[in-house]
Amino acid sequence: MRLTKHIAALRSDRRGVAAIEFAIFASLISIGMLNVVDIAVYVYQRMQVEYATQAGAQAAWHTCDINHLPATTNCSGLNTAVTSAVQSTSLGTYVTLQSGSPSEGYYCVNGSNALQRVSDVSSKPTDCSGVGSPGLQPGDYISISTTFAYAPLFPGITVAGTFATPITRTALMRLG
């Protein structure tokens, strides 16, 4: 009989309900805020990798003039300039060049108005007939590819753990 009175008293007591509701909503809001922070950090770091890749391509263009093409074989300061530019963002040395980067080749615009690689720099084609544009001349492009190992701040709690990692980006720059 005593137990049933205690259970009935607990059912009618409302003093702790507000604290329980607050704890539930605070935890939901906290998880939401952790997601916002993690996603914002990911977007910022991805943006920095994109900027670093573009900076590397611009450094290649700035370092190697048209008289020293192809740049990968005739421009002695190319790798140093590109590496320095790629690591000039707030991410620093954590942004690295991918294996085989920088690479250079001849590109033409195909029928879909997209750049298409037609050959290495070792053998320059006479025109772009290989992609269906015989009236166009191929351009010398350098490709810079970078990578950054992203790690979420709150693994297992936020959706940022499902994002692509590492973050990789590629930039093309016409040299000649």
What are these regions (language model features)?
Residues 145-176:
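Low-complexity, S/T/G/P-rich flexible repeat/linker segments used as non-globular hinges
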Residues 5, 26, 65, 99, ...:
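Solvent-exposed, flexible loop/coil residues
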Residues 2-86:
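Alpha-helical assembly-interface signal, strongest on the long, hydrophobic N-terminal helix that forms
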Residues 12, 138-140, 167:
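Residue-level preference for short coil/turn positions at secondary-structure junctions
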Residues 38, 133-135, 160:
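Residues embedded in well-ordered secondary-structure elements
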